């Protein structure tokens, strides 16, 4: 089991309250299966994995925001493409 020093993670994020929000957001991403862990899982819980990623500087609130925006844009593009294909098929 990996030892996580929360103080190191707090220093990366700025304060402990934002750390809780970022770690929870990242843990949900990993738990839902939509995202792979960026550090070796080593049989750790998703919350520990999220904290380790933050501690190593791999995840920040800004990084999560950018990734989510990219995913939304990709999803919208796919939806537009699907609608266009359906519309062209009806002609």
Swiss-Prot record:
Enzyme class: transferase
Gene3D superfamilies in the record: 3.90.940.10
The protein's Enzyme Commission number: 2.7.7.6
Catalytic activity: RNA(n) + a ribonucleoside 5'-triphosphate = RNA(n+1) + diphosphate
GO CC entries: cytosolic DNA-directed RNA polymerase complex
Pfam families listed in its UniProt record: RNA_pol_Rpb6
GO molecular function, one term: DNA binding
Family to which this protein belongs: Belongs to the RNA polymerase subunit omega family.
Job description of the protein: Promotes RNA polymerase assembly. Latches the N- and C-terminal regions of the beta' subunit thereby facilitating its interaction with the beta and alpha subunits.
Subunit-structure text: The RNAP catalytic core consists of 2 alpha, 1 beta, 1 beta' and 1 omega subunit. When a sigma factor is associated with the core the holoenzyme is formed, which can initiate transcription.
Protein's name according to its UniProt entry: DNA-directed RNA polymerase subunit omega
Annotated source species: Yersinia pestis
Organism lineage string: Bacteria, Pseudomonadati, Pseudomonadota, Gammaproteobacteria, Enterobacterales
């Amino acid at each position: 089991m990996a030892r996580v020093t929360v103080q190191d993670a707090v220093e990366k994020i700025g304060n402990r309250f934002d750390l809780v929000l970022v770690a929870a957001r990242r843990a949900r991403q990993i738990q839902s299966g939509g995202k792979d862990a960026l550090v070796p899982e080593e049989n750790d819980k998703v919350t520990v994995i999220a904290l380790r990623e933050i501690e190593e500087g791999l995840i920040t609130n800004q990084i999560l925001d950018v990734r989510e925006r990219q995913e939304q844009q990709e999803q919208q593009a796919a939806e537009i493409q699907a609608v266009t294909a359906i519309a062209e098929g009806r002609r």
